[in-house]
Amino acid sequence: KPNYKRQFEPFSDELIHYINLEDLPESFDARQ
């Protein structure tokens, strides 16, 4: 299972939030 938090680390919080709105696994720990 990929580590999304590490994968999206370089991205901005806005982009992370936008990506989180798409269909990602519930395990995705996004900072909201």
Curated annotation (Swiss-Prot):
Propeptide residue numbers?
1-22
Q: Does the keyword Coiled coil apply?
A: no
Q: Which UniProt keywords apply?
A: Hydrolase, Protease, Thiol protease, Zymogen
Keyword match Disulfide bond: no
The GO molecular function terms of this record are:
cysteine-type peptidase activity
What Enzyme Commission number(s) apply to this enzyme? 3.4.22.-
Q: Which domain of life is it from?
A: Eukaryota
Query: What GO terms describe the biological role, i.e. biological process, of this protein?
Result: proteolysis
Enzyme class label = hydrolase
Entry similarity comment: Belongs to the peptidase C1 family.
Q: What does this protein do?
A: Thiol protease.
Protein name per the record? Cathepsin B-like cysteine proteinase
Q: Which organism is it from?
A: Fasciola hepatica
What broad taxonomic lineage does this protein's source fall under?
Eukaryota, Metazoa, Spiralia, Lophotrochozoa, Platyhelminthes
